[in-house]
Structures are given as C-alpha cells and as structure tokens.
Design a protein with these regions (language model features):
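N-terminal signal peptide c-region/cleavage motif recognized by signal peptidases
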Residues: 17-21
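Intrinsically disordered, low-complexity segments enriched in Ser/Pro/Gly/Ala and basic residues
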Residues: 1-2, 16, 56
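Bacterial N-terminal signal peptides that target proteins for export
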Residues: 1-12
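Exported/periplasmic ABC-transporter solute-binding proteins
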Residues: 24-73, 80-83, 87-92, 96, ...
Length: 257
C-alpha cells in the first residue's frame, strides 16, 4: 500500500450542484458536512426540477465550514455533522439560533476495501487492533477537529483501544478524504459514517461501533445570520420534508421524525 495518504488532508472537498443552470445571485448556497455530499447533490437536483431554484453546495469538514462562516464566507444554510460545531456557529452568531434543527442521524462503522479479504470484525473491548492493522494505518477524520474523527476517538476510548491505535492513525481533513484512503487501498481499514459506506461501491462495512460507545451522530442545520429570506426558508423546510427524507434514507441517514 502506498503512503501518500496525507495529501488527502490538504484541501476541503468543494462540490457545486448547478442542475444545468448558471450561478445567479438568488441561488441558495449551502455549507454542508462532507458526508452529506451525495445526498445533498441529489436533493439539489430534485429541488431544481421541482422548484426551478438552483442550490450551490460546498462540502468540507464541519469545523472548516464553521470557521469560514465566522470569517464571513457567503452561505445561506449550514449543516454540521455534529452539535459541537453548530454550538460554535451559534456562539459566534454565524447562524440564527431559533432556526437550529437536528435534521439527521447516522452511525459509525469500520470499513475495508471491497476488493480485500477482510472479514467481519466485532468491535468491543476485546478487539485485537494490533493484529487487525498488522502494522498498517487506520484512516479517520482528524480527531482534533473533524466530527467523524471526534466520534471515532470517543468510541475507541470507550472500547479501551485509543492508546494502542492512536499511533497508527492516518488523519484526514474530512470524512470523505478518510473514505478515499480506503477506496484507493492506501489503508486497510477506515472509520467513517454508515452513509459514507453506502455512497461508495469500493468499500465494505466490516464492523459497526456500538451506539453506546460514542455520543449520537447528529446533523443539526441552521439558517445563516441575515439570510432568513423566503427562498432560503423554503429550502430549509424542504430538507425537513418527505422528499428529502427519502433521499437521505437511501444514502443511509436516519431523518429526524
């Protein structure tokens, strides 16, 4: 396996969903956690077909997006992959507090390349990570700031494995970068969200972390300060509705009931 996994942590993943139209001043701009990439692209396309409104989405680690909002980056809606970075956005007055809404849930899984011979792994305090990794690296979101990495660290600590596993981590700048390391067979295993595994045909889930090993994986959203207009509110409501929920479910998320 190659060792150039670090280059995946250089830049945030930015994707523009234009649905065939040129970018216009009245487009809706969404800052969304990287794990939402596929689902939000599909929702943006569907919304454009139904409403004739273009949604432009930028995907990156929630920490990166929260910091960009604090610095005045133009966006209408923020969707974080954890409550911590939404708390930060609220504290910095980047978003409108009353519009905060927990939109989705997710789970935390261990993945391996689909082409690999990796077998199912029971993730508990008895898991032998040293034998499992066999001197190789474990792809994760950077535990210092990426929500997926923060959840992973919490789960590994709960299972008593953090101290032994930490030296073997291959930290990435967002969860999709961690996924890519496994897709490219640059690491034998990775910790990502269940939805990331659903979105990729190059990896397979070999283990699921117990729900009680980490805080719930939640996706809060809120409208950005001074952007509470009718068009933004309409899309905000659409994300809470049945059409968007069907797409989120298709990608492995659990919409809030």
């Amino acid at each position: 396996m190659s060792s150039n996994y670090t280059r995946w942590g250089v830049a945030a993943l930015v994707t523009v969903s234009l649905a065939g139209q040129a970018v216009a001043a009245d487009n809706i701009t969404v800052f969304a956690a990287a794990s939402l990439t596929n689902a939000m692209q599909d929702i943006a396309s569907q919304y454009q077909k139904e409403k004739g409104v273009t949604v432009v989405s930028s995907f990156a680690s929630s920490s990166t997006l929260a910091r960009q909002l604090e610095q005045g980056a133009p966006a209408d809606l923020f969707i974080s992959a954890d409550q911590q970075w939404m708390n930060d956005a609220v504290a910095k007055k980047s978003v409108i507090t009353r519009t905060r809404y927990t939109l989705l849930g997710n789970d935390l899984v261990l993945i391996a390349p689909r082409s690999a011979a990796a077998k199912a792994v029971t993730l508990d305090p008895q898991t032998d990570w040293k034998t499992l990794l066999h001197g190789e690296r474990l792809a994760v979101g950077d535990p210092d700031h990426v929500p997926a990495g923060i959840y992973a660290k919490e789960a590994l600590q709960k299972l008593g494995a953090w101290e032994s596993v930490e030296p073997s981590l291959a930290p990435a700048n967002n969860v999709r970068a961690a996924l890519a390391l496994v897709e490219r067979n640059e690491t034998p295993y990775g910790i990502v969200y269940g939805s990331d595994a659903v979105a990729s045909d190059k990896v397979k889930v070999v283990g699921r972390f117990p729900a009680n090993s980490h805080k719930p994986v939640e996706y809060p959203m809120a409208i950005v300060n001074d952007h509470d207009n009718a068009a933004v509110k309409a899309f905000y409501d659409y994300l809470k509705g049945p059409q968007a929920a069907a797409i989120f479910k298709n990608y492995g998320f659990t919409p809030t009931k």
